[in-house]
């Protein structure tokens, strides 16, 4: 698993992903184990990420999974049930909560954003 900072650089340097998310303007919560991060997105670019320390701060929606689940999802070739966030959701490996309308309206953008933290072939 790469650092959050490295992941954000990968997201913001992916022109196709930014173009796909050009209408996305929101903050969402992404949980890795005990840690939640607020991702602020403007026109498809991640403008800021902050570790959530105040529990009342939240985003439009939340995606949360245990660290081991995300580590498996971010493998270069993820194992069965870890290859896609909906497969993970069906197996109760992640939780999706909140106002899901913008998530579903931009589904491929968010799936690609999350998958962009996958390990590269070396």
Name each model-derived stretch:
Residues 1-122:
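Feature captures hydrophobic
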């Amino acid at each position: 698993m790469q650092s959050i900072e490295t992941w954000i650089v990968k997201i913001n340097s992916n022109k196709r992903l930014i173009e796909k998310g050009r209408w996305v303007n929101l903050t969402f919560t992404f949980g890795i184990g005990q840690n939640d991060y607020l991702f602020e997105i403007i026109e498809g670019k991640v403008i800021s990420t902050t570790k959530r320390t105040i529990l009342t701060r939240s985003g439009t929606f939340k995606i949360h999974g245990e660290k081991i689940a995300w580590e498996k999802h971010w493998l270069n070739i993820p194992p069965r049930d870890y290859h896609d966030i909906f497969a993970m959701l069906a197996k109760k490996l992640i939780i999706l909560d909140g106002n899901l309308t913008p998530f579903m309206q931009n589904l491929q953008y968010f799936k690609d954003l999350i998958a962009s933290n996958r390990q590269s072939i070396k």
